């Protein structure tokens, strides 16, 4: 967010849609009730949402049996619920869980030994991009090589549909986090600076993300352009840290030391 805002004043939110998912935005310190700094109420402060942990109590998000299995088999069961349903680290595994279920029910790869399919995290999210982006024989050949099975054309088309559904749900969930910030802050336009492999490399993520945002924020269907759009923020963490360091040094020179630990 800070890295992008340095060059783009229309930046309203910074987001990561990659191995994990998260977002940050600027809030007035007067709205942060537990904060006591002596700063003017309108002073802006960056808020790190950490919404990858949203609904760890499992009371809101409708989880499938595949989501539940991934959570229970993870190193930290019951944590990062939202992230496990939408982030790049898990989308490929959700796809694998679905296909493994189909195999166990005798729906795909009939009569074949599919031990590779049973390997956890054997399929990464990047392969879902391949399935969606390449409708031809090359993608099917790669699928066969990955799982060491023969894939019929019907099975290949099914796998493409599953990949599409998993990736679409992930993109729409990612939209929910950003749209919640927009609604809370009354944001009607601006740029969401996004970094991460899913945002930058999945061929259909941005389109699906934008469609969902329009639905949630009730944009008119006949709009000429989207009021809120994704912009690229590659290496935002590194550049942003440098910008924040420079800003902090300037604050110290100006005698503003709230929130700065004295050494």
Protein language model regions, located:
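Conserved beta-strand elements of beta-rich interaction domains across eukaryotes
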Residues: 20-22, 28-30, 54, 198-199
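Conserved phosphate-binding catalytic cores of ATP/NTP-utilizing and phosphoryl-transfer enzymes
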Residues: 1-14, 24, 29-35
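Short conserved micro-motifs at the rims of enzyme active sites and ligand-binding pockets
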Residues: 27, 60-61, 204-205
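Conserved A3 ("GATE") glycine/threonine-rich loop of ANL adenylate-forming enzymes
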Residues: 1, 17-22, 42, 49-56, ...
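Short glycine-aspartate micro-motif
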Residues: 12-16, 22, 35, 46-48, ...
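ATP-binding/phosphotransfer module of carbohydrate and carboxylate kinases, centering on a glycine-rich
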Residues: 4-8, 65-263
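E2/UBC-UEV (E2-variant) core
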Residues: 38-80
């Amino acid at each position: 967010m800070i890295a992008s805002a340095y060059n783009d004043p229309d930046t309203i939110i910074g987001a990561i849609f990659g191995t994990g998912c998260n977002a940050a935005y600027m809030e007035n310190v007067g709205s942060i009730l537990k904060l006591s700094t002596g700063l003017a109420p309108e002073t802006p402060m960056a808020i790190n949402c950490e919404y990858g942990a949203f609904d760890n109590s499992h009371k809101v998000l409708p989880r499938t049996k595949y989501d539940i299995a991934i959570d229970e088999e993870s190193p930290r069961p019951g944590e990062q619920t939202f992230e496990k349903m939408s982030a790049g680290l898990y989308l490929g595994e959700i796809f694998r869980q679905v296909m493994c279920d189909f195999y166990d029910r005798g729906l795909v790869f009939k009569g074949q030994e599919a031990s590779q399919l049973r390997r956890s995290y054997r399929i990464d999210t990047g392969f879902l991009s391949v399935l969606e982006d390449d409708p031809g024989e090359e993608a099917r050949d790669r699928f066969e090589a990955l799982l060491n099975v023969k894939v019929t054309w019907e099975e290949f088309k099914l796998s493409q549909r599953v990949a599409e559904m998993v990736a679409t749900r992930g993109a729409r969930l990612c939209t929910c986090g950003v749209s919640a910030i927009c609604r809370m802050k009354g944001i009607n336009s601006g740029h969401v600076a996004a970094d991460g492999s899913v945002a930058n490399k999945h061929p259909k993520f941005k389109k699906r993300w934008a469609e969902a945002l329009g639905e949630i924020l009730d944009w008119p269907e006949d709009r000429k352009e989207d009021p809120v759009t994704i912009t690229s923020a590659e290496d935002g963490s590194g550049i942003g840290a440098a910008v924040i360091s420079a800003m902090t040094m300037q604050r110290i020179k100006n005698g503003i030391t709230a929130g700065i630990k004295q050494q």
